[in-house]
């Protein structure tokens, strides 16, 4: 095998109270075509499919996250890293809180593993992905699909899939400005009050029942948080009016997707289009260009096409 085509979904992490441990895969995808190159060709070259402002930021260097993940597999196997050409079709925007880095990590690992003859198990790939990302909430659902809770137990990970009812519809509103994960983490406190821990524990306990049962009362109460969102919302211009617009249009609630600035609302199918329009309009009303999507939960995760 000299080429492989990999598709990886976007992800939304945290979903309110599940900070750094909960995430879900979304029906928005990046695709990566890996082709082994000859020794006379560059060690790494990029082809950008449908090149736009986002893809112009990517460079074919050894520091490229996609290439680092690709090389990680061969280093793990104790093999030389082959020269490779990678064509990227980018649909997940960069630095927006939709797991773009997770798509690169998982895509690079899965592509390299396939080209090496698939010696690594899915679990081994998952562990490498978590090691590279530093936390599991994006890479685990990006690899496995669905909604996944990741719990570190001793030296291993316990992965618990959550049922997500098909009538709980994710709506994402993506502004045209970026917010780095590093900046979003820098505003978080080092310590929290006991009441804040109890608040989040109760919401995280309620959330899976709301998602599985399509229970509006549970979802409305569960989509709240005191660990990260109160601190990060001030980094996102328009957070309050967008939230108010989403709720007024019928959303159960709204949360920051990952580190932001994308905002995620959950709604009933009949309300989801109205919620999307309301969120986008609210942002545009304060001078922020934005685009909103009514999506689904991607249950497949990463696939080889």
UniProtKB/Swiss-Prot annotation:
GO terms for cellular component: cytoplasm
Protein keywords: Amino-acid biosynthesis, ATP-binding, Cytoplasm, Kinase, Nucleotide-binding, Threonine biosynthesis, Transferase
Pathway the protein acts in: Amino-acid biosynthesis; L-threonine biosynthesis; L-threonine from L-aspartate: step 4/5
GO biological process: threonine biosynthetic process
EC assignment: 2.7.1.39
Family to which the UniProt record says this protein belongs: Belongs to the GHMP kinase family. Homoserine kinase subfamily.
Job of this protein: Catalyzes the ATP-dependent phosphorylation of L-homoserine to L-homoserine phosphate.
Protein name: Homoserine kinase
Organism: Picosynechococcus sp. (strain ATCC 27264 / PCC 7002 / PR-6) (Agmenellum quadruplicatum)
């Amino acid at each position: 095998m000299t080429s492989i085509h990999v598709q990886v979904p976007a992800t939304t992490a945290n979903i309110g109270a599940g900070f750094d441990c909960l995430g879900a895969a979304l029906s928005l995808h990046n695709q990566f075509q890996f082709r082994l190159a000859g020794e006379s060709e560059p060690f790494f070259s990029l082809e950008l499919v449908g090149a736009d402002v986002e893809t112009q930021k990517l460079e074919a260097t050894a520091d490229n996250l996609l290439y680092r993940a690709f090389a990680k597999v061969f280093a793990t196997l104790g093999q030389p890293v082959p020269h490779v050409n990678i064509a990227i079709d980018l649909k997940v925007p960069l630095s927006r809180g939709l797991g773009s880095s997770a798509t690169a990590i998982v895509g690079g690992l899965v592509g390299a593993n396939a080209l090496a003859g698939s010696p690594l198990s899915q679990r081994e790939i998952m562990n490498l992905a978590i090691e590279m990302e530093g936390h599991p909430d994006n890479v685990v659902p990006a690899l496995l699909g669905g909604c996944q809770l990741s719990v570190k137990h001793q030296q291993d990970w316990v992965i618990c899939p959550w049922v997500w009812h098909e009538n709980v519809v994710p709506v994402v509103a993506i502004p045209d400005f970026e917010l780095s994960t590093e900046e979003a983490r820098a505003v978080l406190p080092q310590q929290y009050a006991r009441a804040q821990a109890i608040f989040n524990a109760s919401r995280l306990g309620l959330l899976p029942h709301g998602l599985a049962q399509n229970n509006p009362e549970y979802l409305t109460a569960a989509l709240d948080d005191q660990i990260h969102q109160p601190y990060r919302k001030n980094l996102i211009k328009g957070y309050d009016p967008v939230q108010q617009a989403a709720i007024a249009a019928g959303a159960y609630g709204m949360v920051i997707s990952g580190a932001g600035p994308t905002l995620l609302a959950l709604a009933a199918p009949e309300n989801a289009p109205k919620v999307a329009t309301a969120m986008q309009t609210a942002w545009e009303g304060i001078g922020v260009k934005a685009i909103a999507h009514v999506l689904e939960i991607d249950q497949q995760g990463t696939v080889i096409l």
